[in-house]
Swiss-Prot record:
GO terms for cellular component: cytosol. GO terms for molecular function: ATP binding; tryptophan-tRNA ligase activity. Its EC number is 6.1.1.2. The lineage of its organism: Bacteria, Bacillati, Actinomycetota, Actinomycetes, Mycobacteriales. A motif ('HIGH' region) lies at residues 22-31. It holds the Pfam family tRNA-synt_1b. One of its GO terms (biological process) is tryptophanyl-tRNA aminoacylation. It catalyses: tRNA(Trp) + L-tryptophan + ATP = L-tryptophyl-tRNA(Trp) + AMP + diphosphate + H(+). It comes from Corynebacterium glutamicum (strain ATCC 13032 / DSM 20300 / JCM 1318 / BCRC 11384 / CCUG 27702 / LMG 3730 / NBRC 12168 / NCIMB 10025 / NRRL B-2784 / 534). This is Tryptophan--tRNA ligase. Signal peptide: none annotated. Coiled coil: none annotated. Belongs to the class-I aminoacyl-tRNA synthetase family.
Length: 345
């Protein structure tokens, strides 16, 4: 390992990066408990970079004004949930041009067959059909690789559905480093401690998702409490009436226990013990109460941020400035190593 390589590793060993798309009016409970809650904890021990991937959002059709509104709303939600701009860097992807620039370099390093094997593209394109599938969806993994590699993070919180993309990112980093010299850290993916996988309320064997078949299966963080309570109380369970944690045989009941445990900090075992002899109505009612206790102050904080758009834009501008500084340093190194003529402007 060269001195330059050692310096690069030392600078980035404590850096973490992740993002969440602005493709809905509200983030849902699965977004928070499965990802953002852990991001908040990571701020204390890592140099954290969190971003809103609006470039990724346009791989499918978006209404311009809706995308703009969802992007600023997404930032307000992240801040209200606990992302602290004093402890992390929060920015919008399109505010840092280096993402698109590095994406092209990485696309040129990716084999067509390699990109064609990405299962998310195959799944989504088969559902949409060739005529409604953009080339941007095909190159999505290379943009994701650029998002990550620009900041030279050591760790990337990642869900199971993104593991293949992270493996491609690692492959591209190693390929570039071996061919041109080390410019990138090869990041490790990890699922943070305490991450909770939340399932659809109407189909508790499927992950809660904004693209789910039934909107009643999703708990949106900004929904009116009455709407969320109704969805919790109509959640699919089973017919035996026994409250037990058994994801395989009682997925609906287990999902409600996980939600309540994650929101209250009470262990699942303690919850199950407390419900001995009780029915599903008690479990659903308590889960709905825990959700309302969480979302009520959240929405108040969210409204404060949304009512001061100037402050929101200031926070994002500061984040973009820092992100650009880090990203441009990486991009300049890449451009030099790959043989681009340096610009003197």
């Amino acid at each position: 390992m060269t001195t330059q390589d050692k310096d690069l590793t030392a600078q980035t060993a404590s850096r973490v990066l992740s993002g969440i798309q602005p493709t809905a009016d509200s983030y849902h409970l699965g977004n928070y408990l499965g990802a953002v809650k852990q991001w908040i904890d990571l701020q204390d021990s890592y140099d954290a970079f969190y971003f809103i991937p609006d470039l990724h959002a346009i791989t499918v059709d978006q209404e311009p004004e809706e995308l703009r509104n969802r992007t600023i709303s997404g930032a307000a939600q992240l801040l209200a949930l606990g992302i602290d701009p004093e402890r992390s860097t929060l920015f919008v992807q399109s505010h840092v041009p280096a993402h698109a620039e590095l994406s092209w370099v990485l696309t040129c390093l990716t084999g067509f067959g390699e990109a064609s094997r990405m299962t998310q593209f195959k799944d989504k394109s088969s559902k949409r059909g060739a005529d409604r599938t953009s080339a941007g969806l095909f190159t999505y993994p290379m943009l994701m690789a650029a998002d990550i590699l620009l900041y030279r993070p050591h760790l990337v919180p990642v869900g199971e559905d993104q593991r293949q993309h992270l493996e491609l990112t690692r492959t591209l980093a190693e390929r570039f480093n071996n061919r041109f010299g080390k410019a990138f850290e090869v990041p490790e993916g990890f699922i943070p401690q305490g991450a909770s996988k939340i399932y659809d309320l109407q189909n508790p064997t499927a992950k809660m998702s904004k693209s789910g078949d039934n909107p009643k299966g999703i708990i949106n963080l900004l929904d009116d409490p009455k709407v969320s309570t109704k969805r919790i109380k109509s959640a699919v369970t089973d017919n035996d009436g026994v409250i037990a944690y058994d994801p395989e045989n009682k997925p609906g009941v287990s999902n409600l226990l996980v939600i309540q445990s994650a929101l209250t900090g009470t262990s699942i075992d303690s919850l199950v013990d407390g419900y001995q002899g009780a029915g599903y109505g008690a479990l659903k009612g308590d889960t709905a109460d825990a959700l309302e206790a969480f979302t009520t102050p959240l929405k108040a904080k969210y409204d404060e941020y949304m009512n001061d758009r100037g402050e929101l834009e200031r926070v994002l501008a500061i984040g973009a400035e820092r992100a650009t500084e880090v990203a441009n340093e990486t991009l300049a190194d890449v451009y030099d190593k790959i043989g681009f003529l340096a610009s003197r402007r």
